[in-house]
Amino acid sequence: MNNRIPEDLIERAYQGKSTKEDGLLLLEVPPFELFRFADELRSLTAGDTVTYVVNRNINFTSRCVGTCGFCAFRTNDGKVLSIEEIMEKVREAEKAKATEVCIQGGLLPDVGLDFYQEIAESIKAEFPEMHIHAFSPMEVYHASHISGIKVSEALSKLKRSGLDTMPGTAAEILSDRVRKIICPSKLRTAEWIEVVTQAHAAGIPTTATMMYGHVETPEERIEHILTIREIQKETGGITEFVPLPFMPYNNPVGEKIIREGRYATPGLDDLKIYAISRILLHGHVDNIQASWVKLGKKLSQFALQCGANDLGGTLMEESISRLAGAPNGESISVEELEWMIYGAGRVPKERTTLYKGVRELASRNPGRITGCGASE
């Protein structure tokens, strides 16, 4: 194990030029040395502000023709929400002062792009200020093929219908070796990259994710992060990077690795991923999000000391992680998020999906919270 981070690696990180070899070496650095450097870069980029968004997740169907081995959400005959049922959830979100609705669902066998356009158009007609963060690259790819149009045309249509941004989900690990094992029917690495870069070209920013902790190697994790960096260097359209630990429960891939004696990734490994993501993406992707749903509330707080500067959203509902065994709930209040952030020694700030400030929440602070969680 290397006791210190080499000076030349530090210099490359500051310049935004970290290499694959740097990423692999960082895996061998003592954890708290790694966390300290990632936190230093986080401070340079984001200061002591930790952001979150008031949003609502809407999963409009679990019905899906996909065959992803990691999914506990998919069904063959799940209900598909009607436009009116979706709109009722949007109305509830608006009453809760949400600024964003995040809408995704399974891959429907006979539903083309028109349905997705109708969702966006209905929301914008009633709530023109509501930000629509919706439809994964896989959903767009699937719907465009059913409709017999190019992905670029589908994205242009969705943009005109009111789609504001797109989740960078369905990325899993951007390695075709891995994808053939865990999601053989899903779009290949090059196809995912194409959908995302075409979304950026159409004026639709995206997030980017990485689902890790299943069959991938350490090298494939590092390569995934560097692939995201290359996309960002080309387009500048990625708003945040979200590492997502795999939930190995109630799904075939998870059942297999549990039989092999492995379980969910250890918390220390999760924190290393956040730290290495911050270091490799420094100067390119400013925002690293810690998913409280996946990590849990306490480990998410610790991730804020390891490179993360965002805690995601209030959600209101979340089915996919819950069904895969995530025990951390589906909804969180603004007040609890603020409490968590102060408890980590940081200053909370509500943001929009595009990381514009909505309002500072310091006025709600019941008493300054130190990094150890004690009130002064």
UniProtKB/Swiss-Prot annotation:
[4Fe-4S] cluster binds at C64, C68, C71. Its EC number is 2.5.1.147. One of its GO terms (molecular function) is 4 iron, 4 sulfur cluster binding. The keyword S-adenosyl-L-methionine applies. Pathway: Cofactor biosynthesis; coenzyme F0 biosynthesis. Its cofactor is [4Fe-4S] cluster. It is an enzyme of class 2 (transferase). It comes from the Archaea. It catalyses: 5-amino-6-(D-ribitylamino)uracil + L-tyrosine + S-adenosyl-L-methionine = 5-amino-5-(4-hydroxybenzyl)-6-(D-ribitylimino)-5,6-dihydrouracil + 2-iminoacetate + 5'-deoxyadenosine + L-methionine + H(+). Keywords: 4Fe-4S, Iron, Iron-sulfur, Metal-binding, S-adenosyl-L-methionine, Transferase. InterPro entries: Aldolase_TIM (IPR013785), CofH/MnqC-like_C (IPR045567), CofH_family (IPR019940), Elp3/MiaA/NifB-like_rSAM (IPR006638), F420 (IPR034405), FO_synthase_su2 (IPR020050), rSAM (IPR007197). CDD domains: Radical_SAM. Residues 50-284 form the Radical SAM core domain. Binds 1 [4Fe-4S] cluster. The cluster is coordinated with 3 cysteines and an exchangeable S-adenosyl-L-methionine. Catalyzes the radical-mediated synthesis of 5-amino-5-(4-hydroxybenzyl)-6-(D-ribitylimino)-5,6-dihydrouracil from 5-amino-6-(D-ribitylamino)uracil and L-tyrosine. Consists of two subunits, CofG and CofH. Belongs to the radical SAM superfamily. CofH family. This is 5-amino-6-(D-ribitylamino)uracil--L-tyrosine 4-hydroxyphenyl transferase 1. The gene is cofH1.
